[in-house]
Amino acid sequence: SVESPSQKTSVQISLATNLLESARAEIAPDSHLSVYRLGIEPRGSQLVLTGDVDSVQARVQTLQRFKAAGIPLVDETVVLPASGLGDATWGICNISTGAGREKPSHTAEMGTQLLMGEVVRIFKRVDDSYLSWYLVQSSDGYICWLPPENVVRCTREQADAWTSKPLLIVTQFEAQVRSEPRADS
């Protein structure tokens, strides 16, 4: 029996999807600790690899698996951080406790918490019609989504300068931070 073009495409998609899931299990087994959000998309007679990864190595290893299996595809993966962020791919949590969400939604499960002053790596920004979110990696390695108002973006150098400064702990219920010393404070 001869396969029709749609049957052939369906078989290719199935093989490619299985190969991608196998690669994900080995390259990025814990989705809480690495970004490996890839998918297979059919476009005409071609298969397209789309999505995000957090390292060049993850992308290369994935592409090598497809090549070794003889499955041709068009690569449209993005290695994060996203180029649109410029040099400010780091951030500092600016609220007492930041709720790191599993998905970019306030109703999504909380995956981790960030403390004020904690430095995060910013991978990308997602905007919808009402809200924006950053995909970040916390200092303990967890990947989560934070609203932009919970993070002050900065460069790697600024983040390093921040972490090299002494830590101040305020034990009063109410305090004020002033830019200069005052005799009456």
PLM regions and their residue ranges:
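Short glycine/threonine-rich beta-strand-turn micro-motifs
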Residues: 33-63, 132
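Short, conserved beta-turn/loop elements at beta-strand boundaries and strand-helix junctions
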Residues: 124-132
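Gly/Ser-centered flexible loop/linker motifs
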Residues: 4-44
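N-terminus-biased targeting/localization segments
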Residues: 1-2, 54
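Beta-loop motif signature
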Residues: 93-122, 170-185
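Boundary regions of SH3-family modules and the immediately adjacent low-complexity/disordered segments
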Residues: 6, 60, 64-85, 105, ...
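Solvent-exposed, polar/charged alpha-helical surfaces in well-ordered, non-transmembrane soluble domains
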Residues: 21, 60, 64, 112-115
